[in-house]
Regions:
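Hydrophobic helix-and-loop "lid/oligomerization" segment in the mid-to-C-terminal part
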Residues: 1-132, 137, 142, 146-147
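Short, conserved secondary-structure transition motifs
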Residues: 149-153
């Protein structure tokens, strides 16, 4: 019976979606707690942790962007490798920002508003510092030129 199959599939989909929501909520709480400890006005935010679920990093990064108003990247640490997902804010091209420090990455891809990045775990701190420095430089250039629509806010 197709109706019975459809109902069973819909129920299974609902269960999986509820599991995803629970994982997302848990990671969001952990990431927000970490961000509240490390954020001191940086123009980009990088958070990382071991065993963080790969499938919800982008959503959680978006929440950090909404909270802090700066580009945010969320990394899952797996041994000597960290895999991240980032989201930008406004007209800030996050892809170009990551490209400018690509020597710290193993690989990266994406577009102006969102990126995926893999880096050696040992480079996490330098990556966060250099990304912040890039964003500060971008903001200063925009101010100096009087270009309001690319200011990182």
């Amino acid at each position: 019976d197709n109706y019975g199959e459809c109902c069973a599939m819909a129920e299974a989909l609902e269960d999986v979606n509820n599991q995803r929501r629970a994982i997302e909520a848990e990671l969001s709480d952990i990431a927000k707690e970490q961000a509240s400890r490390i954020y001191h006005g940086q123009r980009a935010l990088v958070v990382a942790g071991e065993g963080w679920h790969e499938g919800v990093k982008g959503i959680v990064a978006s929440r950090l962007v909404n909270t802090y108003g700066v580009p945010a990247l969320l990394f899952t640490i797996d041994g000597d490798e960290a895999r991240g997902s980032g989201r930008s804010v406004g007209n800030v091209n996050l892809f170009e920002a990551v490209e400018s420090i690509s020597y710290l990455t193993k690989r990266f891809g994406g577009h102006g508003a969102a990126v995926g990045v893999t880096i050696p775990t040992k480079n996490l701190k330098a990556f966060a510092q250099r990304l912040d420095a890039y964003m500060q430089k971008l903001e200063k250039m925009a101010r100096d030129l009087g270009v309001q629509d690319i200011v990182v806010t």
